[in-house]
Amino acid sequence: MKVVIVGNGPGGFELAKQLSQTYEVTVIDKEPVPYYSKPMLSHYIAGFIPRNRLFPYSLDWYRKRGIEIRLAEEAKLIDRGRKVVITEKGEVPYDTLVLATGARAREPQIKGKEYLLTLRTIFDADRIKESIENSGEAIIIGGGFIGLELAGNLAEAGYHVKLIHRGAMFLGLDEELSNMIKDMLEETGVKFFLNSELLEANEEGVLTNSGFIEGKVKICAIGIVPNVDLARRSGIHTGRGILIDDNFRTSAKDVYAIGDCAEYSGIIAGTAKAAMEQARVLADILKGEPRRYNFKFRSTVFKFGKLQIAIIGNTKGEGKWIEDNTKVFYENGKIIGAVVFNDIRKATKLEKEILDFYS
């Protein structure tokens, strides 16, 4: 069976790796470089790791695994009748097609948005790194995973960092946990502007409802927009993302979708960890070993500055501190969620316990 994967990000790469010993695999990606670690981009920008450390696998690795890798090649259309992906360089036939096209950065619809940088690719990271090294400072707009991680790492590296967030709380967490994150980042040197709405940008800074904030380098991290254009052009059903069922099947026969481009019952993965787990589950399905992915369960770990935090399961409602660094959330006497600071071993143990609730 010939499996074609469009996209070489965390989900697409992991799927290719999982299937390469079983099927003939081709990966198509519009970027000109092999797989790199997107979660480590902010660490590279801050100067904590060199650029080459972002690339764990060489092109030779793909060849040794028997994976055909077609880089700098954009998929333009899917001919579902002939089962062919049409690219700018030719046609690629498939038996099974997997769309792992990821997402792009959401841009605010404001005057002066051309003065804002975004972070999704290694080339975005290169531009940001060069800009901040020249200026020594950055304004970050957005208090999600990317914004907080970048702010913490840049501040830890000695840059002057201002973070603008339209709300007062972060990552869907409660006020107590949000304040802890804020306090820890403030100790690192991040200056916060909360409940601040971005209105306009120019070369000298940004205008918010709280006033004008000066800064030459402005990085916007206010969310993602799933890349659905290929699917939509090809007549595959889309909403915010490419619509899939609980086996990752799209509305087109023998076409699947995973990662940030895929939408299941209103849910979009949003993290590299989720995309990679979806890839592992889909690989088993395609090998004839059916397995279920729990779309409602979230688990992510990220690091900004000296702070490492794991967010697991449902963290809504009233939680209880069981240790200084661990807050858990219960339902009917069972743990349904947890937030763990600076202890990945404990987070892994709790994740297994919480997964039992969801299974």
Curated annotation (Swiss-Prot):
InterPro entries referenced in this protein's UniProt entry, alphabetically: FAD-bd_OxRdtase (IPR050260), FAD/NAD-bd_sf (IPR036188), FAD/NAD-binding_dom (IPR023753), FAD/NAD-linked_Rdtase_dimer_sf (IPR016156), NROR-like_C (IPR054748)
GO cellular component, one term: cytoplasm
Listed transmembrane segments: none
The UniProt record lists the keyword Ribosomal protein: no
pH dependence: Optimum pH is 7.0 for the reduction of rubredoxin.
Temperature dependence: Thermostable.
Swiss-Prot/TrEMBL catalytic activity: 2 reduced [rubredoxin] + NADP(+) + H(+) = 2 oxidized [rubredoxin] + NADPH; 2 reduced [rubredoxin] + NAD(+) + H(+) = 2 oxidized [rubredoxin] + NADH
Textual note on the cofactor: Binds 1 FAD per subunit.
Pfam family of the protein (one): PF1197-like_C
Subcellular location, principal: cytoplasm
Assigned EC number: 1.18.1.4
Protein name: NAD(P)H:rubredoxin oxidoreductase
Entry-linked SUPFAM superfamilies: FAD/NAD(P)-binding domain, FAD/NAD-linked reductases, dimerisation (C-terminal) domain
Compartments reported by the entry: Cytoplasm
Assembly information from the UniProt record: Monomer.
Sites where the protein binds FAD: G11, D29, K30, K38, P39, A75, A103, R120, D260
Keyword NADP: yes
Cofactor list: FAD
Family: Belongs to the FAD-dependent oxidoreductase family.
